[in-house]
Each structure stands twice: as C-alpha cells, then as structure tokens.
Amino acid sequence: MDLIQQLEQEEIARLNKVIPVFAPGDTVIVSVNVVEGTRKRLQAYEGVVIAKRNRGLNSSFIVRKISSGEGVERTFQLYSPLIASIEVKRRGDVRRAKLYYLRQRSGKSARIKEKLS
C-alpha cells in the first residue's frame, strides 16, 4: 500500500461513517443535509442505485428516481459530509454493474426484480 492509499484509509477511519453495503439495483434512501440561509434540514432522496464507483475516499454512486414523470439522477460522494445517512430499502437482483440502460426505459420495463435472499 503506497502513501496516498494509506492517507486515504486514515481519513476514512477518521470520518467513522456508517455506510451500509449496497450495490447497483438496490433502492436506497439518502438523507442529505440541505442548508437554506440560516436553516439546516434533512432531505430524503429515494431511488435506484444505477452505478457505484469504488475509489477509496473518492467513491461515489448515482441514484435515479422518477419525479413528476421525469427521470432525475443525482451523483453522491460516498464520504461527503453532506450525506447524513444511507438506508437500503430494497435489494435488487441485477446482472450488470452499471444500469445505464434504465435511462431509455420507462414504466414496467424499468422495474427491477427483488432479490429473494
């Protein structure tokens, strides 16, 4: 392990964030800290994880949801201080690491089978 990886591991340990195990296809609820002027509140963002990028401290994931009939995708940094919590609502059974094909689908064809175990 080189010096940069070691520093990243120390930083991850210092943050001591509890991050659940999730994968593409899972439905997650991400609680995001939103600052509006002087007020600070939590905003829940629920959707399907379509991609996950594992790069140590720079890890990120993309969550897609349908809002008012329009597809909305948001990229989150896994160790961002803006993320309060991540909750896995449902496990999806998929055979791909990146689910970008869901962008072209709508309705019933965009559904993901639930993992039974």
UniProtKB/Swiss-Prot annotation:
GO CC annotations, alphabetized? cytosolic large ribosomal subunit
According to UniProt, the name of this protein is Large ribosomal subunit protein bL19
Q: What does this protein do?
A: This protein is located at the 30S-50S ribosomal subunit interface and may play a role in the structure and function of the aminoacyl-tRNA binding site.
Q: Which InterPro entries does the UniProt record give?
A: Ribosomal_bL19, Ribosomal_bL19_CS, Ribosomal_bL19_sf, Translation_prot_SH3-like_sf
A Pfam family for this UniProt protein? Ribosomal_L19
Q: List the SUPFAM superfamilies.
A: Translation proteins SH3-like domain
The family note in this entry says: Belongs to the bacterial ribosomal protein bL19 family.
Presence of the UniProt keyword Ribosomal protein in the record:
yes
